Amino acid sequence: QDDTGNTLSRYTSSAAAKNKRSMALPASYDPRGTEQETPIRNQQDTGACWAFGALKALESDCLMKGILTKDTADLSENHLAWYAYHALDDTTSPLYGDHMSRDYVSDRASYNKGGNADVAQAVLANKWGAVAESEAPFDTASNMASVMKNAASSLRTQSLIQLTDSECYDPYLASDITSRNEIKE
């Protein structure tokens, strides 16, 4: 609690939550057949579902806001998964050590280690992407690891889209109707 008695949470802002609750929600939402959906993509035999889900949501949000078009809304899950777990090797760089895992991760394991909304949010908020799929295409884990291991170091900080605002919702409150309705906004 803060000094005025308000309960603070890393998951929601009370002011933002109050504003969202005052908005009317439609009875249902289905983006199929609109310009707000992107195609389903194949994550193959990797554990990169978290990267696919995060970027699919970001693509849809960018379409709704007019930031991307149907032709440009294809962001790289490879880039997100790789840089979440690979630190910069240059010890003189101000970005040295910026990555999500302190554990050693083999090259191919970047695509199988898994992740979640918190990992995606941390990487994207650090301005490490998202980049277009054409910059770091998704392929087999071994092919992607080989390409990314030899990619120019500038690829790490390229970004077509930068995450500036996001909210995390407590997964333990998934049955809470207010939280579920806020997510739909």
What residue spans do the PLM features occupy?
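N-terminal zymogen propeptides
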Residues: 1-30, 157
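Predominantly the structural core of cysteine protease catalytic domains
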Residues: 24-25, 30, 50-59, 79-185
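Alpha-helical support elements that line or immediately flank enzyme active sites
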Residues: 43-68
